Amino acid sequence: GGSAPNVISEKCVVKLDTRYWNNEDDKYLDDGINKLAAAVWAPGVTQTIERVSHSNAMPLSDATKELVAQITEAAKLEGFDIDWVDAGGASDGNHMAEAGLPVIDGCGPAGGEFHCDREFLRLDTVEERIRMITRFLSLI
């Protein structure tokens, strides 16, 4: 960017990390970004889009819902409830889900503030999650 808000810079770089719940939203967003990039904003100004990486959305399949139910039951048998959240994001699980495999992403210890310097792990959940996964494996 420029040296001040009212100065036009020689070069500007914008980096986006986009997340979405379904592939239709990805297409909508991608089309919108490309439309903005194709616009003429000022004489001599050009825009270039470079997509560095991409993962399709991770759909919640019936097979995955069954795994969620089984892991939830395993947690109850171990004496605690597990709270499921739609976390979004991208992992190798997105690729496996796209191939039709059931995927559970995030059965480990509880924590928060992911991917930043405030990220934390709740140590009091480590043992219970090990018990939960062990119980789940014994049930399948």
Predicted feature residues:
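Metal-dependent amide/peptide-bond hydrolase catalytic core
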Residues: 1-140
